[in-house]
Amino acid sequence: MKYGETVFGEFIERPNRFIAKVRLRNTGEIETVHVKNTGRCRELLIPGAEVALAKADNPDRKTAYDLIAVVKANLGGADCGPGWVNIDSQAPNRLVREWLEGGGFPDGRLTEIKPEYSFGNSRIDFYCEAEGRRDNPSETRKILIEVKGCTLEIDGQGYFPDAPSQRAVKHLRELAKAASEGYECYIAYTITMPGISSVKPNVATHPQYGEAIREAMDAGVRILFLECETKPDRLCISRCTKLISVETMRRSDAYTIANITPSKELMFRAGRSIFEAVCWRAPVAIAAGKGNNAGDGYVVAKLLRDSGVDCRIFLLDERRFSEDGGHYFEICRREGIPYEEFTEETDLSEYGTILDCLLGTGFTGDVRGMAGSAIREINRCGSLGAYVVSADINSGLNGDTGEGSTFVRSDLTVSIGDFKYGHFTGKADEAMKARINCDIGIEII
C-alpha cells in the first residue's frame, strides 16, 4: 500500500482529536493538518516528533494534508533506535484487503472477499469464502475477519486497544457467536510499526477487552499477527503469525487423524520437524513425560541415533506411555538407545542439548512431583550453558494463557501445527528466547 505525494514536518500540538499543528520541513510554515486517527496516540504525538503528511486528493478541502505516520524514539525499548509508526486508522483495512487479494491468507485459497459484512448487530470487516478441506473439497468454508490496527508499543510489545473501546468488545462477542454457528473467525492485528511481532490485550486500559478476547479464544476465534514493513509513505505486510486455542488444535488433530493422516505418521512428522529445526550439540538429553509430547521426543532420539549423535532418554515414568508414544519408545529400546528414569539425583550437566518433552499444550494447573524436579534441573543446566529446546510448548506453561509458576526456560521452542495463544501470552516471553512453528499437515478446523 502506497500513499501519493508525501512531505515531512515537526509535530507541534493537537488542538483536538481531528487536527494537528505541524511545521513543514521544506517551507518552515505552520500548517493545520487532518489527523487520520481519532485515538489518543499520546505516546506518539509529542512536540518535536517527526511526522509524515500525505497530500490530500481534494484541493478544496480545508486541510491540505493528512498526518499518517510519526517517528517514535526508542521503538522496541530503551536501548532501541527510532522507527516510523503508521497511525492512519484507515490503512489496516486497505492493507489487509490487498493482502487477501494477493493470496496472503494462511488457511487456504479464498474464492470470495466481501468487505463490510453484516453479522448480528455489527459490521465485520471482511466476509470470505474458501475452498473446502482436503477430505471435502466441494465444501464452501465461510470466514469472518475483523481487522484491528496496533500502534501502541511498550518495551517492544504491542498492545490493543490504546483507549477503551466498547465497539471492539462488541466485535469480539459477535465473532464468538459466529464461531459457534460454524464460521471460521479471525481477529487480524495489523502491526503498523517495525520490530513488533505480537499484540497483547491492553487490560490496564480496558480490562473488559481482555475478558472479551479470552471468551472469543475459548469459542474458537483465531488470531493473526500481521507484521508490517513500515515506511513514511508506504506499508506492506511482511509476515503473518497465526494463533489458535489448545481446544482448536486438539479438535483439528483428531479430525486430521480420522480423515487424512494416521496418528503415528503425524507423530513422526512432529519429531522430524523438531529434529530438523535444531543445531544439536552432543550429547543430547531427552526429558520425556507420559503423553504424545514424549512420543515426539522418542522420534527425535531415533533420528539422532541414525545421524550418529549420542543421546539418552530420561523418563518421568517408564511404565506409562501414550499408545503412539509407546510405539516409538519401543523402537528406541530395540535399537539400544539408552534410557533411565528421572530421579531427584539425576544430573544433566554433561549434556550439550536438552530436549524438553515433559508436558504438552494440554497441561493445566501446577507442576508437581518429579516433573517439577526435572524442570528445575533443566533450568539449572540451561543457566550453565546447555542449549535447551522445548517441544511444542515449554513444560509448565498453560497452552492457552502462557501462565505457570514452574516452567522450562528454553533457548528455542518448536511449536507444532500452529502457534497456540500460550506462545505469546502470559510468561511466554520470559520462558522462550526464540520460537518457531512447524507445519506437519494438521488440518485446522
Regions found by a protein language model. Name each.
Residues 9, 124-132, 138-161, 175:
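Conserved catalytic cores of phosphodiester-cleaving nucleases, focusing on short active-site segments
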Residues 29-44:
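Beta-strand/loop nucleic-acid-binding surfaces
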Residues 42, 78-115, 134:
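Acidic-basic catalytic patches of nuclease active cores, encompassing PD-(D/E)XK
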Residues 156-166, 176-205:
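Nucleic-acid nuclease catalytic cores
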Residues 192-239, 420:
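Domain-level recognition of nuclease-like catalytic cores that cleave nucleotide substrates
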Residues 234-256, 352-445:
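YjeF_N-associated NAD(P)HX repair module
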Residues 240-284:
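An N-terminal, well-structured beta->alpha segment
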Residues 276-357, 368-390:
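Nucleotide and nucleotide-moiety/phosphate-recognizing core
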